[in-house]
Design a protein with these regions (language model features):
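Short aromatic-glycine-enriched beta-strand elements
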Residues: 260-263
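A generic structural motif
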Residues: 188, 255-258
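C-terminal boundary and immediately downstream tail of ABC-type ATPase nucleotide-binding domains
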Residues: 173-196, 223, 293-295
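OB-fold (S1/OB) nucleic-acid-binding surfaces
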Residues: 201-205, 266-271
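Conserved ABC transporter NBD signature motif
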Residues: 4-15
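Glycine/charge-rich catalytic "coupling/switch" loops of P-loop NTPases
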Residues: 204-255, 281-306
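ABC ATPase nucleotide-binding domains
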Residues: 22, 26-28, 32-179
């Protein structure tokens, strides 16, 4: 690192005065490219770390058989990487990393070379293996779905610095910055100004938000996830329920996506265009006037200077 220390438990792996050689760090890594030796069989690839670590041959064979069973490749030991599918090659890479019983498992974009359906399958497979072996795992990905499915805790890193760290649902439901809100899932970001202790305004649009103690006149940014917004037929003037924002708008576009419909709705009270995710079949078409309802609790306030 440029500064500070790298620790695993009480062990210092790297500091200004200490550097532990890689072979003594008790770590294993799974690469984006799998890094399998094409001239070696599956069993020989998996055995490499055991051989390097001095594990006796008789003991190696038992460990190889056990780990291939764990990754659902029992009977594939004599095959070569070129005879395997992408998903099977990934499982070999996972087996090679796990068989040495590392203290830390590192994965660098391990699923990026797989097609969409296989990538989804391997997410759950990696999670299953993590739960079985209980190895602390550091997983690097730009795929938010992978991060949400696989992790217990996730860190969003921006320009080399941690922007926010927490459980996946915390990052999604309560982002602390504009960057995190946009990076984890889809969202509507509204630049506004605080007009009371618990609400913001943009033009004639006024929103109750999930915050208190705002200073009137202070700039603010509100994040609203598309799935928390409800659309309905526009009725007469109604008094919103406590803690609810009741707005009106017009549908600009309704896009059928199979299991959902993606709407774009322009709000009458301002120049804001909201993206809304709703169930199928579509409940409104382009040009339809609609009511727009969103709970104040779902309007997350973010720093305006992010």
């Amino acid at each position: 690192p440029d500064a500070g220390e790298i620790r695993v438990g009480d062990r210092v792996l790297s500091s200004p005065g200490t550097v532990i050689p890689p072979e003594r760090r008790r770590m294993a890594m799974i690469f984006q490219s799998y890094a399998l030796w094409p001239h070696m069989t599956v069993a020989q690839n998996v055995a490499y770390g055991l051989r390097f670590g001095g594990t006796p041959r008789g003991e190696r064979e038992g460990k190889i058989e056990e780990i291939l069973r764990a990754v659902q490749l029992s009977g594939y030991g004599a095959r070569y990487p070129g005879e395997l599918s992408g998903g099977q090659q990934q499982r070999v890479a996972v087996a090679r990393a796990l068989v040495v019983e590392p203290e830390i498992l590192l994965l660098d974009e391990p699923l990026s070379n797989l097609d969409a359906s296989l990538r989804e399958e391997m997410r759950f497979e990696i999670r299953r293996l993590h739960e079985r072996f209980g190895i602390t795992t550091l997983y690097v990905t730009h795929d938010q779905a992978e991060a949400m499915v696989i992790s217990d805790r996730a860190a969003v890193i921006r320009n080399g610095r941690v922007e926010q760290i927490g459980a996946p649902h915390e990052l999604f439901e309560r982002p602390r910055t504009r960057f995190v809100a946009e990076f984890i899932g889809k969202t509507n970001l509204i630049d506004a100004v605080a007009d009371s202790a618990g609400s913001v305004a943009r033009g004639r649009l006024r929103l109750r938000v999930a915050a208190d103690g705002l200073i009137p006149g202070a700039p603010a940014v509100v994040s609203i996830r598309p799935h928390v917004i409800a659309l309905g037929p526009r009725a007469g003037t109604q008094t919103p329920a406590p803690g609810t924002n009741a707005l009106t708008g017009t549908v600009l576009r309704a896009s059928y996506l199979g299991d959902t419909v993606d709407y774009q709705v322009t709000l009458e009270e301002s120049d804001v265009v909201l993206r809304v995710t709703g169930p199928t079949p579509a409940r409104a078409r382009a040009g339809d006037p609609v009511s727009v309802t969103v709970a104040a609790e779902a309007c997350v306030l973010l720093p305006a200077d992010d």
